[in-house]
Amino acid sequence: MTGPHNDTESPHARPISVAELLARNGTIGAPAVSRRRRRRTDSDAVTVAELTCDIPIIHDDHADEQHLAATHAHRANIGVRVVEPAAQSPLEPVCEGIVAEPPVDDHGHVPPGCWSAPEPRWPKSPPLTHLRTGLQRSACSRPLPHLGDVRHPVAPDSIAQKQSDAEGMSPDPVEPFADIPVDVMGSEVRAAELVAEESAYARYNLQMSAGALFSGHTLTNELAERRGDEHAAGGLLAVGIDLDEDHLDLHTDLAGITSPARGWQSRFEALWRGSLIVLQSILAVVFGAGLFVAFDQLWRWNSIVALVLSVLVILGLVVGVRVVRRTEDIASTLIAVVVGALITLGPLALSLQSG
């Protein structure tokens, strides 16, 4: 090549490398940074960002690793260690994106109160508000009616004219007879009664006209018949009165004839009833005497059988009295019990007294 060689160029005309810049500032042989984002505590160190001011920063971790590998390879070739620049925005220059470092003293300690708290990685979201219960207004509100310009409001009459005819119509006036109560059942029954009366009246008129047509019956005939009926009724009433008077006379005569016979009949009935009572009393005495003698023999023969039969006889007398009387009579019941005990237990008392 015929061009000028690098060796022949003046030191001010050729470009200066990073190693030369670091060597001039006395950073050759400085220890390498362990982490990419950690700063050195040496105040004499000069970063590449301070030297170049036009190197963009890439936030991609993969790109950072590639850049770090290339930097180490370059250091191995030239024997210099370069301080890694801080991560900045890819669209901003490095000088503009330098983060302010905390002040460090000579011993490498950061004084308290001079370092601000690190900002969070992600921006904070706004706090959640409690949801209100109940109905809420929707985000999409209903369109308001067109009321025209605020400065020139539209009259209500014009708004009413825009409404539909159905909304603007008024109901029909109420008829005056609408409040009158209507009895459907009563009207139907009355209509049926009217029809029945009309039909009956029509039949009666037809019958009367037919009778007058064929028999010649007129109003004079009806009056004559009524007069004749009145005379006949008067005659029958007079005859009835006469008959009643005759019947009364006959009844009094018959009563005078039959009164002695009824007296004899009533006397005979009373005598018959008395004789029946006497006969029943005699039969009762005879029956009681026979039972007394029979129980006397039973008590002598077998007292157990006599005792059972005496109980049965007493119960029989009580039942018989209640059947004959057919009423709740405690006196008759007590008399029956006393008579039964006297007939059945009397022989036992006599035998014990004599023996």
Swiss-Prot record:
It is found in: Cell membrane. The chain crosses the membrane at residues 275-295, 301-321, 330-350. The keyword Transport does not apply. Keywords: Cell membrane, Membrane, Transmembrane, Transmembrane helix. Its main location: membrane. It is a multi-pass membrane protein. The keyword Transmembrane helix applies. It comes from the Bacteria. To M.tuberculosis Rv0497. This is Uncharacterized protein ML2433.
